[in-house]
């Protein structure tokens, strides 16, 4: 999801 991309995972 977008939440993972916010941390760069």
Swiss-Prot record:
Gene Ontology terms: biological process: defense response to Gram-negative bacterium; defense response to Gram-positive bacterium
Superkingdom assignment: Eukaryota
Compartment(s): Secreted, Extracellular space
Tissue: Found in the liquid endosperm contained in green fruit of coconut palms, also known as coconut water (at protein level).
Subunit structure: Monomer.
Residues passing through the membrane, by range: none
Record keywords, A-Z: Antimicrobial, Plant defense, Secreted
Name of the protein: Antimicrobial peptide 1
Main location: secreted
GO CC annotations on file: extracellular space
Cited function: Has antimicrobial activity against Gram-positive bacteria B.subtilis (MIC=76 ug/ml) and S.aureus (MIC=80 ug/ml), and against Gram-negative bacteria E.coli (MIC=82 ug/ml) and P.aeruginosa (MIC=79 ug/ml).
Top-level taxonomy: Eukaryota, Viridiplantae, Streptophyta, Embryophyta, Tracheophyta
């Amino acid at each position: 999801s977008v939440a993972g991309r916010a941390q760069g995972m």
